[in-house]
């Protein structure tokens, strides 16, 4: 069976497993005015007439971004996002939570970062987390997507509670971090705001900086809509902490806070098919895995000691055979299937 056929089967299985178990059917969506504020590049931030969506532009002069009007002590942060098309090398679109403006040396952060690519190559993305300024202990995972994120809107979400963090793409949980005592202050614990930005990261974003942003294709436009923010809104510097127990109870009662058996199977398949780097398997960087790592033998066997995918063997031979037989470069492991039967 070809790599392309396998990917299409993966997508169909996702549809069948998750169609009736959506974690996002009853989200309370907000307008820009009632939940968000411009962060920078105001002229490159374009709000829709109904105030329910916003376009972030990057040109040769500046990028742009927005921030939530409030900070939250734990929360659920979600938006439908459509990424720029065509040549996007050097471009980064970020959807993340942070408190770096308040706690500069001890900040917490939860990241979803989309990394642009040259024309004909797919967007990649990565997730990461920091607690209490632990930026020297990066916890990156990097992935491909099973769809073209520049063709349609897809929902990207971050859940953060005192006990767990879940990153979602549409109805698929792609990463779960369970807090344990050994993580200590590395687990994010201080109030955070939501951020979304588009910016030029030509020095590292695409092939380690080999390919730069090309402003012949500007403006690069990222679109956001259907914002959802739930959590305990707090003042991060107040002397008496607020009681957020009711808010946490609400978060943990929602469907997006738990992963059912079908979703867990989808997460396992996603990670087996589309994750191409994990810090948990990077034994050169971390000879002993960090305490939250759950080592999955089926995953570990696919990675080198650098935490990157092994290339070679049967997969490499299959890719070469497919190229010879079908002469379709899009079936290489680095490409994304273009399938309209998505969730």
Swiss-Prot record:
<dbReference type="InterPro" id="IPR013320">
    <property type="entry name" value="ConA-like_dom_sf"/>
</dbReference>
<protein>
    <recommendedName>
        <fullName>Probable xyloglucan endotransglucosylase/hydrolase protein 30</fullName>
        <ecNumber>2.4.1.207</ecNumber>
    </recommendedName>
</protein>
<feature type="binding site">
    <location>
        <position position="285"/>
    </location>
    <ligand>
        <name>xyloglucan</name>
    </ligand>
</feature>
<keyword id="KW-0732">Signal</keyword>
<feature type="binding site">
    <location>
        <begin position="126"/>
        <end position="128"/>
    </location>
    <ligand>
        <name>xyloglucan</name>
    </ligand>
</feature>
<feature type="region of interest" description="Disordered">
    <location>
        <begin position="306"/>
        <end position="343"/>
    </location>
</feature>
<dbReference type="GO" id="GO:0048046">
    <property type="term" value="C:apoplast"/>
</dbReference>
<keyword id="KW-0808">Transferase</keyword>
<dbReference type="GO" id="GO:0010411">
    <property type="term" value="P:xyloglucan metabolic process"/>
</dbReference>
<keyword id="KW-0964">Secreted</keyword>
<dbReference type="GO" id="GO:0071555">
    <property type="term" value="P:cell wall organization"/>
</dbReference>
<keyword id="KW-0134">Cell wall</keyword>
<comment type="similarity">
    <text>Belongs to the glycosyl hydrolase 16 family. XTH group 3 subfamily.</text>
</comment>
<keyword id="KW-0326">Glycosidase</keyword>
<keyword id="KW-1015">Disulfide bond</keyword>
<dbReference type="Pfam" id="PF06955">
    <property type="entry name" value="XET_C"/>
</dbReference>
<feature type="active site" description="Proton donor">
    <location>
        <position position="113"/>
    </location>
</feature>
<dbReference type="InterPro" id="IPR016455">
    <property type="entry name" value="XTH"/>
</dbReference>
<feature type="site" description="Important for catalytic activity">
    <location>
        <position position="111"/>
    </location>
</feature>
<feature type="glycosylation site" description="N-linked (GlcNAc...) asparagine">
    <location>
        <position position="132"/>
    </location>
</feature>
<feature type="binding site">
    <location>
        <position position="208"/>
    </location>
    <ligand>
        <name>xyloglucan</name>
    </ligand>
</feature>
<feature type="binding site">
    <location>
        <begin position="136"/>
        <end position="140"/>
    </location>
    <ligand>
        <name>xyloglucan</name>
    </ligand>
</feature>
<feature type="domain" description="GH16">
    <location>
        <begin position="24"/>
        <end position="224"/>
    </location>
</feature>
<feature type="binding site">
    <location>
        <position position="113"/>
    </location>
    <ligand>
        <name>xyloglucan</name>
    </ligand>
</feature>
<feature type="active site" description="Nucleophile">
    <location>
        <position position="109"/>
    </location>
</feature>
<keyword id="KW-0961">Cell wall biogenesis/degradation</keyword>
<dbReference type="Pfam" id="PF00722">
    <property type="entry name" value="Glyco_hydro_16"/>
</dbReference>
<keyword id="KW-0052">Apoplast</keyword>
<feature type="signal peptide">
    <location>
        <begin position="1"/>
        <end position="23"/>
    </location>
</feature>
<feature type="disulfide bond">
    <location>
        <begin position="280"/>
        <end position="293"/>
    </location>
</feature>
<feature type="binding site">
    <location>
        <begin position="203"/>
        <end position="204"/>
    </location>
    <ligand>
        <name>xyloglucan</name>
    </ligand>
</feature>
<comment type="function">
    <text>Catalyzes xyloglucan endohydrolysis (XEH) and/or endotransglycosylation (XET). Cleaves and religates xyloglucan polymers, an essential constituent of the primary cell wall, and thereby participates in cell wall construction of growing tissues.</text>
</comment>
<dbReference type="GO" id="GO:0004553">
    <property type="term" value="F:hydrolase activity, hydrolyzing O-glycosyl compounds"/>
</dbReference>
<dbReference type="GO" id="GO:0042546">
    <property type="term" value="P:cell wall biogenesis"/>
</dbReference>
<dbReference type="GO" id="GO:0016762">
    <property type="term" value="F:xyloglucan:xyloglucosyl transferase activity"/>
</dbReference>
<dbReference type="InterPro" id="IPR044791">
    <property type="entry name" value="Beta-glucanase/XTH"/>
</dbReference>
<keyword id="KW-0325">Glycoprotein</keyword>
<dbReference type="InterPro" id="IPR010713">
    <property type="entry name" value="XET_C"/>
</dbReference>
<dbReference type="GO" id="GO:0030247">
    <property type="term" value="F:polysaccharide binding"/>
</dbReference>
<keyword id="KW-0378">Hydrolase</keyword>
<dbReference type="InterPro" id="IPR000757">
    <property type="entry name" value="GH16"/>
</dbReference>
């Amino acid at each position: 069976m070809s790599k392309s056929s396998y990917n299409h089967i993966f997508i169909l299985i996702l549809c069948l497993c998750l169609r009736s178990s959506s974690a996002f059917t009853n989200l309370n969506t907000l307008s820009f005015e009632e939940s968000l504020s411009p962060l920078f590049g105001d002229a490159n931030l374009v709000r829709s007439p109904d105030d329910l969506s916003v376009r972030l532009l990057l040109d040769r002069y500046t990028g742009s971004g927005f921030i939530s009007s409030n900070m939250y002590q734990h929360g659920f942060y979600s938006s439908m996002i459509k990424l720029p098309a065509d040549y996007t090398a050097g471009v980064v679109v970020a959807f993340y939570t942070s408190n770096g403006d308040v706690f500069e040396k001890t900040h917490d952060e939860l990241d979803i970062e989309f990394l642009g690519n040259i024309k004909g190559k797919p967007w990649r993305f990565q997730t990461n987390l920091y607690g209490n300024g632990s930026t020297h202990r990066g916890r990156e995972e990097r992935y491909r997507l099973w769809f073209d994120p520049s063709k349609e809107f897809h929902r990207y979400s971050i859940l953060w509670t005192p006990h767990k963090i879940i990153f979602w793409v549409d109805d698929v949980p792609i990463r779960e971090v369970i807090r344990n005592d050994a993580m200590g202050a590395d687990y994010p614990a201080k109030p955070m705001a939501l951020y979304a930005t588009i910016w030029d990261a030509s020095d590292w974003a695409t092939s380690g900086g080999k390919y730069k942003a090309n402003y012949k294709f500007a403006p690069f436009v990222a679109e956001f809509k259907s914002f959802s923010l739930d959590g305990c809104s707090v003042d991060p510097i107040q002397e008496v902490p607020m009681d957020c127990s009711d808010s946490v109870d609400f978060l943990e009662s929602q469907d997006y806070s738990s992963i059912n058996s079908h979703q867990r199977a989808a997460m396992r398949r996603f990670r087996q098919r589309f994750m191409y780097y994990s810090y948990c398997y990077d034994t050169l960087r971390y000879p002993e895995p960090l305490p939250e790592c759950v080592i999955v033998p089926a995953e570990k066997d696919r990675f080198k000691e650098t935490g990157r995918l092994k290339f070679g063997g049967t997969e490499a031979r299959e890719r070469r055979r497919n190229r010879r037989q079908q002469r379709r470069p899009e079936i290489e492991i680095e490409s994304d299937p273009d399938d309209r039967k998505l969730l």
